């Protein structure tokens, strides 16, 4: 077979170049130690910031209880919709 002969001939003629240390050095990056983690700085550190947080007013939204109590029915949360079955022919 002609194709097989050409393939074998090319395989025998192939001479790979040996890899040198310079090739390996060019293909990789040198390893370096990562930077040490920094301690996060909080905005307004100190006792005065804590006191300000403690004295801050809490915002609360109140719903009117009368309308919600009238509209609530405990049986409404688990209702199946009735499906009309097609007539049998």
Swiss-Prot record:
User: Which cysteines link up through disulfide bonds?
Assistant: none
Where it sits in the cell: the answer is: Mitochondrion inner membrane
- Superkingdom of this entry's organism? Eukaryota
Q: Which UniProt keywords apply?
A: ATP synthesis, CF(0), Hydrogen ion transport, Ion transport, Membrane, Mitochondrion, Mitochondrion inner membrane, Transport
What InterPro entries does this protein's entry cite? Answer: ATP_synth_F0_suH (IPR019711)
Using the UniProt record, give the first listed, main subcellular location: mitochondrion
Specify the signal sequence span: none
Q: Does the keyword GTP-binding apply?
A: no
Membrane topology, as annotated, equals: Peripheral membrane protein
What PANTHER family does this protein's entry cite? ATP SYNTHASE SUBUNIT H, MITOCHONDRIAL (PTHR28207:SF1)
Q: Member of which family?
A: Belongs to the ATPase h subunit family.
Its subunit composition reads: F-type ATP synthases have 2 components, the catalytic core F(1) and the membrane-embedded component F(0), linked together by a central stalk and a peripheral stalk. The central stalk, also called rotor shaft, is often seen as part of F(1). The peripheral stalk is seen as part of F(0). F(0) contains the membrane channel next to the rotor. F-type ATP synthases form dimers but each monomer functions independently in ATP generation.
Q: What protein name applies here?
A: ATP synthase subunit H, mitochondrial
Can you name the source organism? Pichia angusta
What's the source species' lineage?
Eukaryota, Fungi, Dikarya, Ascomycota, Saccharomycotina
Instruction: Tell me what gene encodes this.
Output: ATP14
């Amino acid at each position: 077979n002609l194709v097989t002969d050409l393939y074998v001939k090319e395989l025998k003629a192939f001479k790979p170049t040996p890899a040198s240390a310079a090739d390996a050095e060019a293909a990789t990056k040198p390893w370096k130690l990562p930077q040490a983690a920094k301690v996060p700085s909080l905005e307004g550190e100190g006792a005065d910031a804590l006191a300000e947080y403690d004295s801050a007013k809490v915002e609360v939204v109140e719903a009117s209880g009368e309308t919600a109590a009238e509209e609530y029915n405990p049986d409404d949360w688990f209702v199946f919709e009735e499906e009309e079955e097609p007539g049998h022919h």
